[in-house]
Design a protein with these regions (language model features):
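Gly/Ser-rich "nucleophile elbow"/oxyanion-hole loop immediately N-terminal to the catalytic nucleophile
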Residues: 1-18, 25-31
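Loop/turn elements at helix/coil->beta-strand transitions in domains of secreted/extracellular proteins
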Residues: 4-8, 29-33, 66-71, 117-120
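A conserved short beta-strand
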Residues: 30-44
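Acidic/histidine-rich helix-loop elements
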Residues: 47-55, 132-144
């Protein structure tokens, strides 16, 4: 296959989102951008006990480093599996600007790194532990809300 090595992306939901964060942080020369939906940020846990604490919203690492590759994060504020604070921890320390809106019948707050478009955080109001804008026939998908797939593809195109 003739793959453009400059246009390789990784994305995932929940543990897959955490793995996407790890892959982007560990191999920044391989991935052009990362998409995380309802997952833990890089370096938020070091073992099972700290992972479970992080999933409950407790910050277990002294500081989560800002992503070194462009990263877009989605998280529902009613997620009872992985607390939504994890999405915020993944961009803590960045200078941010926020906007609110509604898509697919669900309100959201979108936060973008000030001065560059390499970090985006979407807090989905009323959403749980499911892929936003997904097909109702799927598992861990929520047809309500912004289309996370479409927004990740938009973000990847400008990353």
């Amino acid at each position: 296959y003739n793959v453009d090595a400059r246009r390789v992306y990784v994305a995932g939901l929940s543990a897959g989102g955490a793995m996407a964060a790890i892959m982007g942080a560990t191999y920044p020369d391989l991935y052009a951008a990362v998409g995380i939906h309802s997952g833990l940020p890089y370096a938020s846990a070091r073992d099972m006990a700290s992972a479970l604490a992080a999933m409950r919203g407790h910050r277990t690492a002294a500081a989560t480093p800002l992503p070194s590759v462009p990263t877009i994060v989605f998280h529902g504020d009613r997620d009872t599996t992985v607390h939504h604070r994890n999405g915020e921890y993944g961009i803590a320390g960045a200078e941010l600007r926020s906007e609110t809106g509604e898509a697919g019948g669900r309100a959201f707050t979108r936060t973008v790194h000030q001065g560059r478009s390499s970090l985006e955080h979407w807090l989905l109001h009323g959403a749980g532990h499911a892929w936003s804008g997904g097909d109702a026939a799927g598992s861990y998908t929520d047809p309500a809300g912004p289309d996370a797939t479409r927004e990740m593809l938009r973000f990847f195109a400008i990353a």
